[in-house]
Amino acid sequence: MRTRIFAILLLCSLLWPYSYMQPPWGYNQATRLDVLHAVFSEGTIAIDSFHENTGDKIEWNGHFYSEKAPGVVVIAAPAFAAVYAVLGALSIDSSSELGWKISEWFTTVFSVGLLAALSALFLFQLLKKYTSSRTALVSIFAVYLGTLIYTYAVMLFSHTATASLIIIALWAIDNGVGLLDSGKLSRRHSLLAGGCLGLTIACEYTSALSAGALLLFVLFKNRKHAMYLLCGSVLPLLLIPLNNWLISGSILSIPYEYVTDFPGMQKGLFGIEFAPNISVMWQLLGSQYRGLFFWSPFLLLCIPGFVFLWKKSTSAFWLMLITPIVSLVLISSYSYWHGGWALGPRHLASVLPFLCIPAALGCHRFKKAGIVFAALSILLTGLGTVLQPLAPEGKTKLLTDFYIPMVQSGEIRESLGSLLGLQSILSLLPLFVISAVLMRLTWKAIDTRTAA
């Protein structure tokens, strides 16, 4: 009973901030919503009736289609179906301004937002096994409210979905072949890991690197379970050729091949030129502009954490070290490494699961530093996410030149608080108060008797 109460409180602690602010408008989320509206209102994936609100599209044989991988749309479909039915029952046109706002808000929260919150339960169990219950919870709050996972859980992007699926896959692998120690050699867990990784790739093609690294890890530990993992990945991976076929009639024709509004995508392999850039790497890791460690200093604890990880498992050490490094090198040579209007290095989202485990190990060793860094991460990333997760591309000093002036001017976007009549900074009061109460209750609900 105590475990169930804890799980419910943890879910609420995350879903509340994920749902509080109205999702901001942008090409990335609009193109996926266009597909959902087209499928449910017109029975087609062609977005001809909606395409003018996005630049993330291609034109093929006189029709417009989303250029994005299909996975996020599939994940979001159940939530959209529910809100579409409710809007219909209330005689609200889903394509009207009000209908669009309601459907986007609800769909975002109960697709990528809910997936992220559920994955936190899996990560908690994984971290608790190798640290302690309290360290695991501090790490959960830091990762899910103080990193890119929070930022992209409030919009219909692919990044939080991919990170969440990889986290569930890591938990499943730990119960299959074992992550830091020997596993249970559970076939169903290896199949689950495969399903999550296949869906990860179907959400974001570049996450194939992280998925491939995990496949090699499982293959190294147990060939039979690597086959189970591959079998589990087949069904979700079929979403990719199905989407290609529905658009162009060819299962091998990826929509990115026909993107014209972003000329950088024509360079190299879909924009990746395999020319590592040290300056860009710094921007991706340490700068105000897109720095992963600047906005999420809790992840710096992965540095001492890797030392402890080496002592626990050399194979896991190399997995969690090399995967982020290779991803960093590749993204540094990507034409759009900055991610356009964004907060943080969104193209590195798929490496977060590989950093949060060693960061939790570091937090377990340096508990006071862990709490301080977790609080700082939540403050910085939370500030940016609440104010404007789609920060202007041209602002290089986001904190000092963009977010702090927004706070000083009281410029706050629409939220549940503003719908209740609260204005400016006061509109955030329910978010902060209820979040603090939920986090406190979650902390008190931990069953420390199961601590490692």
Task: Give a label for each model feature.
Residues 151-161, 291, 344:
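Short acidic/glycine- and proline-prone juxtamembrane loop motifs at membrane-interface regions
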Residues 8-13, 143, 195-197, 234, ...:
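Transmembrane alpha-helix segments characteristic
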Residues 142, 161-181, 189-197, 354-358:
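Specific aromatic-rich, kink-prone transmembrane helix
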Residues 2-9, 88-98, 118-145, 163-164, ...:
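Transmembrane-helix signature of polytopic, membrane-embedded enzymes
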Residues 36, 139-140, 144, 150, ...:
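Membrane-interface alpha helices of multi-pass inner-membrane proteins
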Residues 215-219, 293-316, 355-361, 367-375, ...:
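Hydrophobic, aromatic-rich transmembrane alpha-helices
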Residues 175-179, 209-242, 303-313, 357:
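Perimembrane helix-loop-helix junctions
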Residues 48-61, 245-309, 392-432:
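Membrane-lumen/periplasm interface segments of multi-pass, membrane-embedded glycan/lipid transferases
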